[in-house]
Amino acid sequence: MPSHKTFRIKKKLAKKMRQNRPIPYWIRMRTDNTIRYNAKRRHWRRTKLGF
């Protein structure tokens, strides 16, 4: 990835960065909750974004 990024790419990277975080702890504490972790977590070295 070049150091000079276009604004479009930068926006996409920012969105993926926001998506790539664990779920908040209070969501796990809710009643009848089945979500234990973020299944769509991405590791920067294992899985690439493809753009």
UniProtKB/Swiss-Prot annotation:
Domain of life: Eukaryota
Keyword Ribosomal protein: yes
UniProt entry keywords in alphabetical sequence: Ribonucleoprotein, Ribosomal protein
Any one GO BP annotation for this protein: translation
GO cellular component: ribonucleoprotein complex; ribosome
Recorded GO MF terms: structural constituent of ribosome
UniProt keyword Transferase, yes or no: no
Family of this protein: Belongs to the eukaryotic ribosomal protein eL39 family.
Name of this chain's protein: Large ribosomal subunit protein eL39z
Species the sequence originates in: Oryza sativa subsp. japonica (Rice)
